[in-house]
């Protein structure tokens, strides 16, 4: 028996110079007979052995594909190791075929690289894609693995590469023909293309041998069309634009603070404006406080000078006589019809406590009832409270927020106020409310502080059943306008 002929041994040590296209190192069979069976049954974790298998099963594996172009976007945080991996690849493949285009680094996203294969052959595509797809997982799945040309068992090849959309195949659709031969194909055409004029292919391979076998069959059917000169720049621009849109949709809230505005420059521009506004507000508040204090002191001085002492009988008689004279003088100016139709209010008020008064029909009048006021007297008293409130508000700042209270006759006039309540609120921008009996007590302090003797001779408060109290809240100048409108209702 003749001795078995040993095969030629090729050591895949790194050559001194760069190898030409298609001349990758081959491996020895270590004296074992080479099996030329089904290529899908062959499995090895060594990239060189898998390349040797592709070379033996594909006759055109070393022939370059005319007009071929493949782009593989890669994102990595370890730029140093990536540069070392690219240097190792360039030892076996020319830089005219394998090119790398770095993208500007973005915060917390790592460095983006565009790996471009141009005018390549089947061995080039299998070699580059296997090494780079394994590199993405090797950094954290197998950090102890030092060789870039061995794919450990626990690493799956996953990723996406892009081809021009004008590719053609000799046997119908690429993925359709693949699924006839291998239902669970590791290379799948993506239905939705994120980059215009480019077709995306997704890789999901559990073993490097299966991936290389399917990739070699894939490119053996592909025919590339003609591409524009600036196709790489076009791809980079469109890919980056699409990625930015996706990032903006996913990370919309963080970009408001970090990506859309330059916070430092924004603060430097707005800080002086805010400080100026703050200083003006502080100055305005101090001026308002000083003005209110001065107005309050003046308001306290005037009523004390005009208010007579309650325990002095002489002052009471003098004030009552002055009141009667002033009332008589004021009522002389009223129209003649008031004097004819009803008796004088001066006589009624002066003779109120003098005893019962009889008319011609013999009936007694109600002048003997203490505290009784006619409707006209009640109206004059309410007008006096409105005018006194206007003077009290005018003594304060026109920008101060106040709450005032005035009286209104229940008969006839309060219904008119109710009908015009919404109109009064809209014209004055004040909160105008007619108080009920349960919250009537809140107006007592304000009404007692008013000095109505300067505006009416009927200074005593009418019976609560004959009047209603109106509350007006808002800014000082608007309250004055609201009081003028209510006064206009009572006078006309």
Curated annotation (Swiss-Prot):
Residues 1-35, 300-371 are annotated as: Disordered. GO terms for molecular function: mRNA binding. Residues 18-30, 329-353 have a biased composition (Polar residues). Residues 1-15 have a biased composition (Basic residues). Keywords: mRNA processing, mRNA splicing, Nucleus, Ribonucleoprotein, RNA-binding, Spliceosome. It is found in: Nucleus. It holds the Pfam family Snu56_snRNP. Its main location: nucleus. One of its GO terms (cellular component) is U2-type prespliceosome. Signal peptide: none annotated. GO terms for biological process: mRNA 5'-splice site recognition; mRNA splicing, via spliceosome. Component of the U1 snRNP particle, which recognizes and binds the 5'-splice site of pre-mRNA. Together with other non-snRNP factors, U1 snRNP forms the spliceosomal commitment complex, that targets pre-mRNA to the splicing pathway. Component of the 18S U1 snRNP particle, a subcomplex of the spliceosome. Interacts with the nuclear cap-binding complex CBC1-CBC2 (yCBC). Directly contacts intronic sequences of substrate pre-RNA. Present with 361 molecules/cell in log phase SD medium. This is 56 kDa U1 small nuclear ribonucleoprotein component. It comes from Saccharomyces cerevisiae (strain ATCC 204508 / S288c) (Baker's yeast). The lineage of its organism: Eukaryota, Fungi, Dikarya, Ascomycota, Saccharomycotina.
